[in-house]
Amino acid sequence: MEGNSVVTPEIERLIQAVETADSAAKLVGAVRALAATRSPLAVPQLTTVLRYNNPGAAVAAVDGLIQIGDAAMTHLLANMDGYNYGARAWATRACAGIGDPRALALLQEAALTDFALSVRRAAAKGLGFLRWQSLPQEEQETVQKAIYDTLIQVCEDPEWVVRYGAIAGLENLAKQAQHYRQPLKDFLQSFVEQEPEAIVGERILWTLENIGPI
């Protein structure tokens, strides 16, 4: 758990409601209520919920973790479940949504190798939205290059939704790190000629328009 805060009676009550929920619907409601507090004190329980076989509760927990933000990252990364694929996939989605650069390695691996296309897509887009600006100046260029190189690789993914996510991530990176605009333009102008899916081709053209003149 982040910080030195003590669990308040209200948070304790909401945690207990999650732990004692006796139906899928009650569990979802209890998780939503706990997530709505946006309290770092809720992070351990929300992370535990990711292991449950309840997609509705997992979605609510992921949304809550994203709202809590950076304060959730230490616990999330320290408690990645290597034996429970579902929990790890949900945690990866949470990390992608939070945008903390500490998730770089996790998102790179997920974007390139996860067998679930929804996880690869979330990781790819999440890479492009990592807040590398929060890092020390001397680390920023290395992280930018890691993001760019990974997303260029992801553009070869066989699933169009994953390629779409990679293009969205690349666009945001180029908007924030302007020295990537020309390399990205060069890549996309070539890539669009090879892209078989019209919707991805349209996304590429939109990106070229959005990143604007050099």
Swiss-Prot record:
InterPro entries for this protein: ARM-like, ARM-type_fold
Subunit structure: CpcE and CpcF associate to form a lyase.
Protein name: Phycocyanin alpha phycocyanobilin lyase CpcF
SUPFAM superfamilies recorded: ARM repeat (SSF48371)
Keywords: Antenna complex, Lyase, Phycobilisome
Origin species: Synechocystis sp. (strain ATCC 27184 / PCC 6803 / Kazusa)
Membrane spanning stretches: none
Free-text function comment from the UniProt entry: Required for the chromophorylation of the cpcA gene product.
A single cellular component GO annotation: phycobilisome
GO molecular function: lyase activity
